[in-house]
């Protein structure tokens, strides 16, 4: 099967041709603004001017003609409206002229599938970082799911904005990477991770302030990279634990950054995962990735009438079925958490687990020590207060020098393991009661996923290191949002589970509708919703 793919979501117009085995050609032209960032209409003018030449060269390089095609695929979204309209119009014109079937493709799906094609990865979790996107994506229950993402600006956008403050034209990320190599001092920047989601606007504001104070520019660039990259690699590692998968795929324009690539490699090596780093040429937006995704969709039954190919600027990857992937959950985490190593033992005759937070080699040592100590102290205090509800194990000892917590051992199954084999409405109600009790004390968990809930004779919460005492209403809504998203992603009957949870939780919490509105606001901050 021979497929032409046309990409044009942002700054790059590209045409690529693939078959089942290889990439036959890939030709691109990138719009570079004279000043500032990308101007959508100017980029669209560039695309309209270059698209004929890009398509012609792609056919010439492949030694093919339009008549040889079996399918035309184009990037339907997400992206900049004027740019998307140029590429979709060209794709429709080719489809009509040569009587070829047409498919609109989700742009992030293209990044996943070209990465899999080039690397041989089977069922990876993808860390996708570009100018507009920062997402952790995994295939679960028939389609790709967004497990975590930025709640404001993309990481690449943040780097480009700061580069403009330095007087560096677009694209500024590569220059920041070079400047960071000469940085030494780690400046304190907000480390903004909430559960599986991240935020970069606060980091940008703080970096801009350091610039106004006259701090060394190389040090600011170094700190900007170390902090923001550590955040996304941490969320990626948590996603690996959360899904039990063992393959990592790195993609997107920012994935060309050598420091980010080394951090992902270090994390994978230390944790026993396989890391696949997309070839730098194909990290950038390209037509071949759209062709590859379109081919897989078509081979698995996807068809679109031309009237169904309207662009969608807010097109999310989790809207697209992906039946060609077989989920492979092959890693057991009985002796480790996302950030810890667990060993069983005794403490003065009591059965306990020793939870150690080891160094993370991918992080700057100064940042790593700060995060580990803060998280461990926070976990100790929250577990202490939460134990009063009966829904947390006892913490017997806190060794801040060796970074070890000694915790009562609970015999039971995580919620994730429990619901793999059966569905129990009563257990959902027990979980809802326990969560309501925790929130009633104004305690938030901070990472309320099925791997951090143990089902035994009652419900226990573990790993509260990202939670809050005297928490805000939004902290509570964040807990619920993360738990609901986990249920929808991990379980076929996730929506039914949420319904039963809500019914029970609302009995124990005043004005649950208020929290539902907060959850909607949190969801609205995600990209393309």
UniProtKB/Swiss-Prot annotation:
Binding note for cofactor: Binds 1 Fe(2+) ion per subunit.
Enzyme Commission number(s): 2.3.1.234, 2.7.11.1
Occurrences of domain Protein kinase (ranges): 331-529
CDD domains: ASKHA_NBD_Kae1_arch_bac
Superkingdom to which the source organism belongs: Archaea
Subcellular location(s) per record: Cytoplasm
Residues binding ATP: 335-342, 355
Amino acids binding Fe cation: 107, 111, 128, 285
Active site: 447
Cofactor(s) essential for the protein: Fe(2+)
Gene Ontology CC, one term: cytoplasm
Gene Ontology MF, one: protein serine/threonine kinase activity
Annotated segments matching region Kae1: 1-324
GO BP terms: tRNA threonylcarbamoyladenosine modification
Record-listed L-threonylcarbamoyladenylate binding positions: 128-132, 160, 173, 177, 257
Family that this chain belongs to: In the N-terminal section; belongs to the KAE1 / TsaD family.
Record's function text: Required for the formation of a threonylcarbamoyl group on adenosine at position 37 (t(6)A37) in tRNAs that read codons beginning with adenine. Is a component of the KEOPS complex that is probably involved in the transfer of the threonylcarbamoyl moiety of threonylcarbamoyl-AMP (TC-AMP) to the N6 group of A37. The Kae1 domain likely plays a direct catalytic role in this reaction. The Bud32 domain probably displays kinase activity that regulates Kae1 function.
Quaternary state and interactors: Component of the KEOPS complex that consists of Kae1, Bud32, Cgi121 and Pcc1; the whole complex dimerizes.
Name of the protein described by the UniProt record: Probable bifunctional tRNA threonylcarbamoyladenosine biosynthesis protein
């Amino acid at each position: 099967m021979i497929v032409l793919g046309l990409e044009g979501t942002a700054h790059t117009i590209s045409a690529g041709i693939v078959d089942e085995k290889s990439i036959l050609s890939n030709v691109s032209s990138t719009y570079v603004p004279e000043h500032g960032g990308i101007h959508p209409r100017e980029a669209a003018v560039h695309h309209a001017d270059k698209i004929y030449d890009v398509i012609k060269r792609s056919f010439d390089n492949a030694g093919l003609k339009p008549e040889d095609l079996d399918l035309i695929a184009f990037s339907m979204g997400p992206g900049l409206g004027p740019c998307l309209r140029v590429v979709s119009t060209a794709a429709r014109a080719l489809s009509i002229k040569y009587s070829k079937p047409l498919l609109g493709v989700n742009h992030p799906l293209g990044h996943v599938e070209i990465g899999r094609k080039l690397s041989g990865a089977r069922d990876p979790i993808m860390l996708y970082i570009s100018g507009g996107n920062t997402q952790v994506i995994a295939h679960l229950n028939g389609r790709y799911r967004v497990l975590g993402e930025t709640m404001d600006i993309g990481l690449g956008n943040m780097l480009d904005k700061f580069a403009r403050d330095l007087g560096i034209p677009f694209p500024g990320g590569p220059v920041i990477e070079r400047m960071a190599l000469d940085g030494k001092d780690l400046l304190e920047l907000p480390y903004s991770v909430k559960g599986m989601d991240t935020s970069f606007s606060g980091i940008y504001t703080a970096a801009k302030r350091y610039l106004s104070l006259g701090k060394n520019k190389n040090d600011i660039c170094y700190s900007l990279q170390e902090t923001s990259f550590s955040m996304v690699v941490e969320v990626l590692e948590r996603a690996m634990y959360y899904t039990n998968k063992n393959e990592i795929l790195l993609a997107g324009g920012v994935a060309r950054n050598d420091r980010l690539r080394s951090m992902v490699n270090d994390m994978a090596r230390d944790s026993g995962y396989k890391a696949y780093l997309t070839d730098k040429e194909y990290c950038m937006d390209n037509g071949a990735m759209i062709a590859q995704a379109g081919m897989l969709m078509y081979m698995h039954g996807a068809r679109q009438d031309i009237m169904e190919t309207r662009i969608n600027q807010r097109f999310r990857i989790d809207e697209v079925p992906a039946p060609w992937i077989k989920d492979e959950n092959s890693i057991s985490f009985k002796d480790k958490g996302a950030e810890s190593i667990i060993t069983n033992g005794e403490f003065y005759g009591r059965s306990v687990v020793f939870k150690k937070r080891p160094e993370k080699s991918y992080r700057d040592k100064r940042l790593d020590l700060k995060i580990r100590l803060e998280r461990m102290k926070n976990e100790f205090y929250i577990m202490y207060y939460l134990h009063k509800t009966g829904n947390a194990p006892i913490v017997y000892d806190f060794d801040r020098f060796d970074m070890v917590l000694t915790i009562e051992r609970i015999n039971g199954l995580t919620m994730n393991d429990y619901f793999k084999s059966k569905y129990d409405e009563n257990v959902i109600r027990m979980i809802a009661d326990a969560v309501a009790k925790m929130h009633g004390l104004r305690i938030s968990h901070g990472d309320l996923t099925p791997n951090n809930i143990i089902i035994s004779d009652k419900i226990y919460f573990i790993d509260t290191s990202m939670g809050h005492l005297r928490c805000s209403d939004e902290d509570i809504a964040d807990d619920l949002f993360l738990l609901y998203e986990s249920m929808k992603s991990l379980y076929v009957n996730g929506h039914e589970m949420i319904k039963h949870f809500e019914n029970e939780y609302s009995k124990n919490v005043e004005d649950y509708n208020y929290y539902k509105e907060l959850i909607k606001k949190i969801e609205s901050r995600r990209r393309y919703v």
